[in-house]
Amino acid sequence: GDGTVTINEVLSNDLAYDHPTAYALNNIYPNPFNQITTIEFSVPDNNNEKVRLRVFDIAGRMVRDLTNRPYTSGIYKIEWDASHLSSGIYFLEFRVGSLRDIRKINLLK
């Protein structure tokens, strides 16, 4: 299969943290990871742009399209199960409109 993707909204008592002011790829943990990693990102108020998260292998082939939809304001976590993939270096692309952030992730089995 394609693995599992779980999307959760993170809640916090810190008001500034609950209401981000910009789109951002915050954290990927653990990294390196053995099967499951968590990707955290922020979505600001008054948005209607789609958040797209994709994973590419070292050769530039897309191996997973994690999400491609608008989100309401908040901090989100996506858990990605990569157990069906081989060990190696992968690249996570976070894209919203003209914003593009790429991070290297390392799958160790």
Name these PLM-found stretches.
Residues 1-17:
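Short, compositionally biased serine/threonine- and acidic-rich segments at solvent-exposed termini, linkers
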Residues 56-63, 90:
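Short, glycine-anchored, charge-dense loop/turn motifs used at functional sites
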Residues 12-29, 33-55, 72, 77-80, ...:
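Glycine-centered coil/turn sites that cap beta-strands in beta-rich domains
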